[in-house]
């Protein structure tokens, strides 16, 4: 088979023309469309990536906001709990203080009532005991007891301490012109009066016996008393009763103090 060169050349030219036409009207538009599509897809992918990044950033922002909110909520809860605990502590302390104050006031009131009661009881008991003893001694008073009282008084008057003798002598010397009273619970026999005057004469020889006045005072309760301005000498059971009453008061004071401390 013979190959016509012209035909071959014509075919080649036709092929090249076809290729050029295909490239111009088919391949190039398709390529452009494909590139445009690729660019569009790339842009869409880029936009999607950007949107995803924005979404992630927004999600991160919301997560941080949620964490901050949770942290603030926890902080608020902690502060509220601390405030509630502090308020509860203050209320409890206030209640304790009020209870302590009430108890202290109650104890003080009880102590005052105890003091008033014990003082009244002390006074009444001492007075009653002294009054009872006075009645007993008055009932038991007899001539022998009176003589013994006079003997005791005369002995004491005759044997005064040296310092007291000086006081008596000075008082007698300064009492010139005044009545000097010698009191007794019972009427004094004349011989006993003479004995007393004799002893007093030793202390004041210049003193007249007439200045001495003997009187009877039942309230002395079994006793005798010499009273001069600036000096007094007495022996009475009343003195011992007063001492007893003082001792009783001291005992009561000690008991009261002990009860108050225990209360």
From Swiss-Prot:
GO CC, one annotated term: plasma membrane-derived thylakoid membrane
Transmembrane region(s): 2-22
Keyword Ribonucleoprotein set for record: no
CDD domains hit by this protein: ATP-synt_Fo_b
Topology with respect to the bilayer: Single-pass membrane protein
Compartments reported by the entry: Cellular thylakoid membrane
Keyword Thylakoid: yes
Keywords: ATP synthesis, CF(0), Hydrogen ion transport, Ion transport, Membrane, Plasmid, Thylakoid, Transmembrane, Transmembrane helix, Transport
Pfam annotation, one family: ATP-synt_B
A GO term for molecular function: proton-transporting ATP synthase activity, rotational mechanism
Recorded family membership: Belongs to the ATPase B chain family.
Description of how the protein assembles with itself and partners: F-type ATPases have 2 components, F(1) - the catalytic core - and F(0) - the membrane proton channel. F(1) has five subunits: alpha(3), beta(3), gamma(1), delta(1), epsilon(1). F(0) has four main subunits: a(1), b(1), b'(1) and c(10-14). The alpha and beta chains form an alternating ring which encloses part of the gamma chain. F(1) is attached to F(0) by a central stalk formed by the gamma and epsilon chains, while a peripheral stalk is formed by the delta, b and b' chains.
Function according to Swiss-Prot or TrEMBL: F(1)F(0) ATP synthase produces ATP from ADP in the presence of a proton or sodium gradient. F-type ATPases consist of two structural domains, F(1) containing the extramembraneous catalytic core and F(0) containing the membrane proton channel, linked together by a central stalk and a peripheral stalk. During catalysis, ATP synthesis in the catalytic domain of F(1) is coupled via a rotary mechanism of the central stalk subunits to proton translocation.
Name of the protein in question: ATP synthase subunit b 2
Organism: Acaryochloris marina (strain MBIC 11017)
């Amino acid at each position: 088979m013979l190959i016509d060169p012209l035909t071959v050349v014509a075919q080649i030219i036709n092929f090249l023309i076809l290729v050029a036409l295909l490239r111009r009207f088919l391949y190039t538009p398709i390529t452009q469309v494909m590139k445009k599509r690729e660019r569009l897809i790339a842009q869409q992918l880029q936009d999607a990536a950007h949107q995803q990044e924005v979404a992630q950033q927004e999600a991160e922002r919301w997560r941080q906001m949620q964490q901050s909110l949770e942290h603030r909520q926890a902080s608020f809860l902690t502060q509220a709990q601390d405030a509630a605990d502090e308020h509860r502590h203050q209320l409890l302390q206030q209640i304790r203080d009020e209870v302590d104050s009430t108890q202290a006031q109650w104890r003080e009131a009880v102590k005052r009532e105890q003091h008033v009661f014990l003082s009244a009881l002390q006074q009444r008991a001492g007075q009653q005991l002294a009054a009872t003893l006075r009645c007993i001694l008055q009932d038991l008073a007899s001539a022998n007891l009176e003589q013994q009282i006079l003997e005791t008084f005369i002995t004491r008057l005759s044997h005064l301490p040296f310092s007291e003798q000086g006081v008596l002598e000075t008082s007698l010397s300064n009492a010139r012109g005044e009545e000097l009273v010698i009191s007794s619970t019972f009427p004094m026999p004349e011989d006993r009066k003479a004995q007393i005057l004799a002893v007093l004469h030793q202390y004041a020889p210049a003193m007249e016996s007439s200045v001495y006045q003997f009187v009877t005072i039942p309230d002395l309760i079994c006793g005798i008393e010499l009273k001069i301005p600036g000096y007094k000498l007495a022996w009475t059971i009343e003195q011992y009763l007063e001492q007893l009453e003082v001792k009783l008061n001291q005992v009561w004071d000690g008991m009261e103090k002990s009860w108050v401390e225990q209360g």
